[in-house]
Design a protein with these regions (language model features):
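Tandem CBS (Cystathionine beta-synthase) repeat/Bateman regulatory domains
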Residues: 1-135
Length: 135
């Protein structure tokens, strides 16, 4: 349960400014776009397969740590394919639980099979910190 026993939903905390990139973008290009937008992840959409994945700053750092060239490495070889999706109607507790269970820090938010947002651990903590304290 959220602090003070209040229930807030993913729609209350998610970002609706979503960075969407293609699978053939290089890691450097993805990192540059993420930096410019001040986001820690991007939704990777492959129009050929209608598939969706996610690339995070952690994925990029992992590749660089293994000595891979960010100018040559395509995003598609480093993204997460088995994306766990949230809905705007999930509670923040449900989102946090899914993140904990899956070991990740971002969830793509879908509504009617459309990407409508992204929620991160930071978004959840920020929303919880704004709740009034329990007396």
């Amino acid at each position: 349960m959220t602090p003070a026993g209040e229930t807030h939903h993913v729609r209350d905390a998610m970002s609706t400014e979503i960075l969407m990139i293609g699978p053939r973008h290089t890691l450097r290009h993805a990192a540059k776009l993420m930096s410019q937008r001040h986001v820690g992840s991007a939704v990777v959409h492959n129009p050929e397969t209608a598939g969706i994945g996610i690339i995070t700053e952690r994925d990029i750092l992992h590749a660089l740590g293994h000595g891979l060239d960010p100018d040559d490495e395509p995003v598609e070889t480093h993204l997460t394919h088995n994306v766990v999706f949230a809905t705007p109607h999930w509670t923040l507790d449900q989102a946090a639980e899914a993140m904990t269970r899956g070991g990740f820090r971002h969830l793509v938010v879908l509504e009617d099979d459309q990407v409508v947002g992204m929620i991160s651990v930071r978004d959840i903590v920020r929303a919880w910190s704004r709740l009034p304290s329990a007396a």
